UniProtKB/Swiss-Prot annotation:
Annotated Pfam families: GTP_EFTU, GTP_EFTU_D2, GTP_EFTU_D3
EC number(s) given by UniProt: 3.6.5.3
Subcellular location: Cytoplasm
GO MF annotation terms: GTP binding; GTPase activity; guanosine tetraphosphate binding; translation elongation factor activity
Taxonomy, superkingdom: Bacteria
UniProt keyword annotations, A-Z: Cytoplasm, Elongation factor, GTP-binding, Hydrolase, Magnesium, Metal-binding, Nucleotide-binding, Protein biosynthesis
Family: Belongs to the TRAFAC class translation factor GTPase superfamily. Classic translation factor GTPase family. EF-Tu/EF-1A subfamily.
Protein source organism: Pseudomonas savastanoi pv. phaseolicola (strain 1448A / Race 6)
Record's function text: GTP hydrolase that promotes the GTP-dependent binding of aminoacyl-tRNA to the A-site of ribosomes during protein biosynthesis.
Protein name per the record: Elongation factor Tu
Residues covered by region (G1): 19-26
InterPro entries: EF-Tu_GTP-bd, EF-Tu_GTPase, EFTu-like_2, EFTU_2, G_TR_CS, P-loop_NTPase, Small_GTP-bd, T_Tr_GTP-bd_dom
CC terms in the record's Gene Ontology section: cytosol
Ranges where the record places region G3: 81-84
Length: 397
């Protein structure tokens, strides 16, 4: 079968299921594709196919992730589901599958469990902006008061981690019933349809990359005689046009320059857009004033920083990571976008050491400033070998 053309007419939103092991994340994922295929005509994906998720690599780390898609009336959803807890941690920290919103699946029969809490905390740390709750397995709970109790517990937990617990939509249902095409007490297909409608209404349409302020990590710098200095890279977001004022941020003092030309595949263009690899010609900037690892940005939008809090995942020995734990004062290289910068780690109070395979919050101090914002991803390296991954949770200085 020929690949279907990607439908650009519907706005595109990235979501994913999070929650404790065996609370029904994968069943709900399969049920979503089934219900949407029947109601809105998107393709159906079976449980087994989602459960045997293929491996993929992100920032040197292997992660198992299943990707499915489905449509509502007004949107196209790309949905990620991970088989194991470690895969979630890695996925969220590396940003392999960035989410515009998450569906927290919690078993009504068991209530919130340790991974329920951990996934909410991770969502907060890595900047997942919206969470919608699906209280699953409600067909196994006869007591309405018990359902209410679990709902209150989930709301409290969300509020603990600065999500709006009282206003978070909670849908009660049974993913298994929906997957089997049943709908007793409107707990099956109706509940899943309601979930899709809630995703439509509660998760706002994400700002398109081209509408965000311009940012391009600098990969290479060339000097072209008679024309000046050209920096090349892939535009991460926004648009750069000829004559735009720009700033060069990171590693040294911020400098101001102007775009005098944009090139792609040796052709001159009027502008460079998000996702494109291009060269930007800079007025009055010398070849030695710029280096790989800096970023080219719209003036005033990004600042350089050296101190931040981060959520990190440390690779296990089996994943090619360290064989031994590290302690406070650990000094690896932090790889941001296109370059390594050395930094030292402070551990949270009461944490003596960090073992391979752990995820932990650390405070980092870099020896040189890097252009950064909350949510920026990085790799942790020792002599060019990836030993971990992280995300900036909060900038300190």
């Amino acid at each position: 079968m020929a690949k279907e053309k990607f439908d650009r007419s519907l706005p595109h939103v990235n979501v994913g299921t999070i929650g404790h092991v065996d609370h029904g994340k994968t069943t709900l994922t399969a049920a979503l594709t089934r219900v949407c295929s029947e109601v809105f005509g998107s393709a159906r994906v079976d449980f087994d196919k989602i459960d045997s998720a293929p491996e993929e690599k992100a920032r040197g780390i292997t992660i198992n992730t299943a990707h499915v898609e489905y449509n509502s009336l007004t949107r196209h959803y790309a949905h990620v589901d991970c088989p194991g807890h470690a895969d979630y941690v890695k996925n969220m920290i590396t940003g392999a599958a960035q989410m515009d919103g998450a569906i927290l699946v919690c078993s009504a029969a068991d209530g919130p469990m340790p991974q329920t809490r951990e996934h909410i905390l991770l969502s907060r740390q890595v900047g997942v902006p919206y969470i919608v709750v699906f209280l699953n397995k409600a067909d196994l709970v006869d007591d309405a008061e018990l359902l209410e109790l679990v709902e209150m517990e989930v709301r409290d937990l969300l509020s603990t981690y600065d999500f709006p617990g009282d206003d978070t939509p909670i849908i009660i249902g049974s993913a298994r019933m929906a997957l089997e095409g049943k709908d007793d007490n409107e707990m099956g297909t109706t509940a899943v349809r309601k979930l899709v409608e809630t995703l439509d209404s509660y998760i706002p349409e994400p700002v398109r990359l081209t509408d965000k302020p311009f940012l391009m990590p600098i990969e290479d710098v060339f000097s072209i005689s008679g024309r000046g200095t050209v920096v090349t890279g892939r535009v991460e977001r926004g648009i750069v046009k000829v004559q735009d004022p720009l700033e060069i941020v990171g590693l040294r003092d911020t400098t101001v320059t102007t775009c005098t030309g944009v090139e792609m595949f040796r052709k001159l263009l009027d502008e460079g857009r998000a996702g494109e690899n291009c060269g930007v010609l800079l007025r009055g900037t010398k070849r030695d004033d710029v280096e790989r690892g800096q970023v080219l940005v719209k003036p005033g939008t990004v600042k350089p920083h050296t101190q931040f809090e981060a959520e990190i995942y440390v690779l296990s020995k089996e994943e090619g990571g360290r064989h031994t734990p590290f302690f406070k004062g650990y000094r690896p290289q932090f790889y941001f976008r296109t370059t390594d910068v050395t930094g030292s780690c402070e551990l949270p109070e009461g944490v003596e050491m960090v073992m391979p395979g752990d995820n932990v919050k650390v405070s980092v101090t870099l020896i040189k400033p890097i252009a950064m914002e909350d949510g920026l991803r990085f790799a942790i390296r020792e002599g060019g070998r990836t030993v971990g991954a992280g995300v900036v949770a909060k900038i300190i200085a």
